[in-house]
Each structure stands twice: as structure tokens, then as C-alpha cells.
Amino acid sequence: QPLRRALAIYEDKMNTVDVMREYNEFERKRINSFNGVKKTDSNLTKFVSNNRHGSYISFFSFDESLTESIVKEQLAYFNKLNLCFEWKTYSTDKPTNIGDVLLANGFEKEASESFMVLDLSKTVGESFDESQITEVSDSVGIRDAIRVQEQVWGGDFDWQYNYLLSLKEHSPDSVSIYVVYVNDQPVTSAWLTFNGSSPFAGIWGGSTIEEFRGNGYYSLLLNKRIAEAKSKGVKYLIIDASDMSKPIVSKRGFEIVATTTGYTSPNS
């Protein structure tokens, strides 16, 4: 019996290597290029934003001996355009010396997050109060969603606003944006993205203004997005989970696939 139970648990466990391979193929190499352009060569895929902020290296794979020259090449490319960019890395990426080389070239390391995946075929929907959620799709509503992010994280999120607005205008089915209002004040915002025929949907945002935390708004929007992704027949739901959100999403069945760390360019 114990052996059978152990085998059942083993069989039920997500094959994280396969999931990461699929994610690289469908999400990191095939990116939405609204409010910017996607550029690909044999070494990497990048998104070049129309705004000063918002550009990033999405996928990369090359020999360790080339790391220094490729990093310098990308720095020169974005500097020429006067753009800041993020080099997003995963613990499964090659070459493994990428982090050290980025730091040596003046990049700033951001806080690492857990890249987590939920197999939607194995999750059960939870009931939630739909009446507390407002879906936004126009410039005013999207601005409200971004205002929450700016208050929580600090800084200018205009690039994020422009990206979401452009995505909603040009490919409305690719993104669903949600806000929780309390007395007409936006206090929590989050969005859900779909990428064509990709088996992955992504949950982003998920932030609540400090004085309104502890009311279940994060879980409310999490449950809404799980239900929507499941209803659209998507296979996996992904999140870059901070230490604060990791215990909440773990309870819903999300599993850690990798650690993800962003490095911001020196001119940011």
C-alpha cells in the first residue's frame, strides 16, 4: 500500500522539465509584440518597447564563452536607442554564468521570485463573490489598474499602461484586466494574459494597496482568473510568485518549476 501510494504521488507530480521546455517554446520565444517589436537571432529573443521602460530579453541560449560579448552587444544596442531593459533569467537557463556577467556589467539584480505553474486539469474551481470584481477595458479603467501597481511598488508604470492598453485595443481576447474598487477607489488590480495557441495563460499584477490587505481581494482575483483560464481550455496557468503570494497560490495547487530573477540595465 505505501508503495502504491508513493507511486500515485509520483505519477501525479508535474514533470517540471517538460513544462519548462514547453514554456520556453510557447511563451519566451513567441511573445506578444504590442507597443513594441520582437527581435530574434540565433542567441536570443527580445522585446523592444516603444517606451523608455518595458523592453526585455525574453529567451536566450548560447555557449558560456559568448556570454560577455553578447551582454555587451545588447547593452550597446539598447543604449543606442536610449532604452532601459530587463534581462529575465530562470534557474534552468544556460549559460549558468549569465547572472555573474550581468552584475559585472553594471546590471542591478532584482528580488528573485518563484516561477510556478498550475495544471488546470487537476484543479477544482472555488466559489467567489463575482460582484466585488470589475473588469476594465478602456483607458480610464486600465489607468485605475496601473495606479494600484504604482502605489504598491512605487515608480512610473506608464510603459505597463501603454502595453495593456495597446494589447486590449489590438487583441482584446489576449488579456482580461480586473480591479476591485472600495468606495470608488481602486484598491486591488490583476490581469490574465493569453498568447494565441499557447497552452499557457499568465497571471500578473495581483497587488493590493497596503491599508486594504487582509480582506481576501488577492484570493478573489486569483480565483476569478483560475476560473476564466479553465473555462477557456488552457492547460497551464503561470505566475512569478513573490514570497508574499507563494503560500496563497501553493494552496491552490501551483507548483514551483524554477526560480526567476530579473536584472535591470545600468541606465535604468
Give the label of every model feature segment:
Residues 2-77, 81, 94:
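N-terminal charged segments
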Residues 4, 11, 66-132, 137-140, ...:
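Acyl-donor-binding surface of acyltransferase catalytic domains
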Residues 48-58, 194-203, 213:
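A conserved beta-turn-beta hairpin within the catalytic core of GNAT-like acetyltransferases
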Residues 68-75, 205-208, 214-227, 231:
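Conserved acetyl-CoA-binding loop-helix of GNAT-fold acetyltransferases
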Residues 81, 148-159:
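Helix-loop element at the rim of GNAT/NAT acetyltransferase active sites that forms part
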Residues 139-151:
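A short, well-structured alpha-helix characteristic of acyl/acetyltransferase catalytic modules
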Residues 157-209:
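A conserved beta-strand-loop-helix scaffold within acyl/acetyltransferase catalytic domains
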